[in-house]
């Protein structure tokens, strides 16, 4: 008969296989992983290792915690089940209710102490990758021990927390545990939201060294707004979103009319959602209203606002906003990045025209975008725009059989 234990074993086997894969990768790339910088790829690997590699070790210490408590109260361990991602200590003994409570709690204490030990041992490592792994492993153990496992015990008829929160047997101890448990969760939530468990990624070792120097400078010069905003921008670009948001909110308390800060907030919101949300668009508009003047930043703010307008079906307004973004970049001596941005803006404005069935204007903008993509020598971009031409052709043909829009290559 298929049981819950069989299900746990299947999941454990799958997780172990992934853990072995990760270990092979880590062993093969050990030297490069320890070396600077902390890249986005290394962060992703460390995040996975904090689960697939650290959790099996934490499970062992969890079960060891139970066993030590059993022995401390004169009990006998008659079975020690360890399946990497789950375990069980079978024991016998004449316990008081308080001792039963502590035996159940000891497993969670073992997991938390293991997570704390990893962070403590790695916090001063010369390798930023190992420091980040320590942070994430500690974070995951807090989450697993104080949130996931209690919920697991509440849903299923097994688990330590059913004993820990047995108010009929240990009303005082269970009550104190509940208060401490909730306090820990509040602190965890606050520190997590503040970005305590985050670090930004960097593309090069030089960039990381510059960031480390910048971090020291910003701490020494809290009133230097340029330094603070540059620091926040690197945090955001390095996907330390909570840390960036915390710094931004602190910055805005002291500089409530900073256009650049609102632009950073807009970019941060868009990055977290992978799309331009209503909040991100509102921050972008606030940045423009607050006197944003640098052309590239003006273009960026308008582009975010226009993307949201287009998503909300406000085609005519989106066309106007995209036009303002294009105008801002056209006033510059364009760099390669500017040309990429312009091509994307023309393509986006073409889409806004197309949704309003303004096929002539849509064709002209798509022609501009395609020309820029060819000048850049970006074959992938050209291919994407060719697909847009096909869609435009299809829409135009449905609107009027007499009208045909051909791509530049036809």
Language model features with spans:
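Hydrophobic transmembrane alpha-helices and their immediate loop junctions
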Residues: 1-230, 237, 242, 273, ...
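Structural motif corresponding to the intra-repeat A-B loop/turn of tetratricopeptide repeats
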Residues: 238, 272-274, 312, 356, ...
